[in-house]
């Protein structure tokens, strides 16, 4: 809320990336967001087969209140003097993206990819519900696992303020993508991942398949140690994206990997 007030005082729009939460878990516009973005490749598509994104303009932000957005306020020559902020309100930002950015970049999604995303939306609530249900059980399993130092998931936060925020904003659950820290270092983390069989070793997330990765040596390998720690990534950090498989199978796979690590 303090950040939101700061943003309001600065007269800049509040943009929220809601990819991991999805509209099923939280709707940022209802809490004051001006623009919401999604990587549709993740939960919306659901199967890691299609690349695309979504930008949602709430229509609540006044782009004419200062001189920070001349490209939206000033007359556009290519559209015969149209001012997107004045003539296309309240959907000024969305209209600008369609009329200018898509025209200039050619980033138009193909019909078949659009079809795949629309199909994904039909089962979004069912899939995310299962993702979250499985994730909560996996979190509890990892929390009680002696070879785990820490599990980073909002459902088990010991911070009272975080608990209250979690209950307020995530009544349907805190998502299925999280990290945990295994006892040891990078060597132990990589050995654990190498012994997973049901989990796929992929950098993607939010797939119906359960995914695991070692961020320090993959997605964030270009960062130095200080930069990694600044982002909450340690050598023993493992990221999981819990899928929709039978949760007993998921936990059994994790259990077998821990047994291999203990040998």
Which residues make up each language-model segment?
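Residues that form or flank phosphate/diphosphate-binding pockets in enzymes
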Residues: 23, 187, 249
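PLP-dependent enzyme catalytic core of the Aspartate aminotransferase-like
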Residues: 1, 127, 194-195, 210-263
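Short, surface-exposed connector motifs at secondary-structure boundaries
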Residues: 8-12, 123
């Amino acid at each position: 809320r303090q950040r939101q007030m700061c943003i309001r005082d600065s007269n800049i729009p509040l943009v929220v990336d809601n990819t991991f939460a999805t509209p099923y878990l939280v709707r940022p516009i209802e809490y004051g967001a001006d623009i919401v973005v999604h990587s549709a490749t993740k939960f919306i598509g659901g199967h890691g087969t299609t690349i695309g994104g979504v930008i949602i303009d709430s229509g609540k932000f006044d782009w004419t209140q200062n001189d920070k957005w001349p490209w939206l306020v000033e007359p556009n020559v290519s559209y015969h003097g149209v001012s997107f902020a004045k003539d296309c309100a309240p959907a000024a930002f969305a209209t600008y993206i369609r009329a200018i950015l898509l025209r200039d970049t050619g980033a138009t999604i193909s019909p078949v990819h659009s079809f795949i995303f629309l199909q994904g939306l039909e089962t979004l609530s069912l899939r995310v519900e299962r993702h979250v249900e499985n994730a909560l059980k996996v979190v509890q399993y990892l929390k009680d696992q002696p070879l785990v130092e820490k599990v980073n998931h909002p459902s088990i936060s010991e911070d009272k303020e975080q608990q209250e925020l979690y209950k307020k904003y995530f009544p349907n659950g805190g998502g299925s993508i999280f990290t945990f820290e295994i006892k040891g270092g990078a060597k132990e983390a990589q050995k654990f991942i190498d012994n997973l069989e049901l989990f796929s070793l992929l950098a993607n997330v939010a797939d119906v398949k359960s995914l695991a990765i070692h961020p320090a040596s993959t997605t964030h390998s270009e960062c130095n140690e200080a930069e990694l720690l600044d982002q909450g990534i340690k050598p023993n950090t493992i990221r999981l994206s819990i899928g929709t498989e039978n949760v007993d199978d998921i936990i059994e796979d994790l259990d077998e990997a821990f047994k291999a690590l203990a040998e």
